[in-house]
Amino acid sequence: VDGVRINQCKVDRQGRLFFGTMINEEQGNFLNYQKRIGSFYRFTMSQGLVELKDKVGLSNGIAWNNNWTKMYFVDSFDLTIYEFDYDLMTGNISK
């Protein structure tokens, strides 16, 4: 996508790649993050690219709890840590 870049990525225990995108800094000043053109994705060889969350301002931290039933994703523009139910078998998150 034009104007965005990958900012943060992590791999789960099953080898699935999760990553967030954000506006490319070359697009202007910090206020451009309000455009929320970033997204949060999962990538696997079998399923390809799957968008999990849209309208991300500033993609940051990705983590799971100890038993892999919760996933955490940070949108620093919102100063928010999102918590999702996480299915380790499928890689799906609650919406």
Range-by-range predicted roles:
Residues 2-17, 23-24, 34, 39, ...:
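Beta-rich, blade/repeat-based domains predominating
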Residues 14, 45-46, 67-68, 76-78, ...:
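Short strand-connecting beta-turns/loops that link adjacent beta-strands
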Residues 42-44, 92-93:
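Phosphate/pyrophosphate-binding betaalpha-module
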